[in-house]
């Protein structure tokens, strides 16, 4: 009898999956990534997985080879984490991972490329184009006020500037005239030029901020965000009390359905996996909906939008959502396995 009990215990030990949590990294969203990583670690511990945290750096490949995990949970945000880089490394190492693959991650992270995809699918998106730092300094801008200037491949509203007037432009020009010695701190509300010579400039869409979650190839729901300030910026996204979350979004039914359809259409077209979040602006004055971007690695703490929508629509708590992501990700084939 004791032998049977011991064998059962050993079997359970052997069946425990080792999951590495990749967080931190090099991007300006490092702080948020570490928060996501800690939340995932807490959930994995409560779910009795063998969870190992890795703060991603140049030695990450060696650490992963040594650990040889059953799965890597990607809790990274921004460049190198959600742009296909870490996904490519994991493919080479033969390690399964969560969220979307190399191609979907790379395309979704590139705002200019994403806008072309949206238009090709018949989805309206703000008018805009790629602009150089030099053209900004010379005021060689082909879009009328107000307009939005943002990095091609950043998240969390980092480096986003809304310009309503010539006075705003002069402030922007002064800011961009300074060439930083290094990247500005992630917590700065008005970061200086982001060590890139190209950005996206697009028309400003007044109205309502909307976020749609896709979970397991199903559009789960759309949330409305009402920031306390004019703009849903870094502080509003990650500071309690700086934005009000309204669910379901208080918009016309046909517009609500349109957000679900657009989010799912882009998710499927790019080949996104497990979860994604699409962002929209709705202008009630002219009844237009514009898709801004799709996020393959949305923020992932218990207070983040996708977990909140999953809880409100499906009754799925954070721990259960983590388990769903893991189980779904383990079923995905690695690129090298696809024939």
UniProtKB/Swiss-Prot annotation:
Q: Which GO terms describe its cellular component?
A: cytoplasm
Record-annotated ATP-grasp domain positions: 115-327
Residues annotated for Mg(2+) 2 binding in this entry = 293, 295
User: Which cofactor(s) does the record list?
Assistant: Mg(2+); Mn(2+)
Q: What class of enzyme is it?
A: ligase
UniProt-annotated binding residues for ATP: 142-211
- Binding of Mg(2+) 1 occurs at 279, 293
What function is annotated for this protein? Cell wall formation.
Protein family membership: Belongs to the D-alanine--D-alanine ligase family.
The record, for NCBIfam families, names: D_ala_D_alaTIGR, PRK01372.1
Stated name of the protein: D-alanine--D-alanine ligase
Source organism lineage? Bacteria, Pseudomonadati, Pseudomonadota, Alphaproteobacteria, Rickettsiales
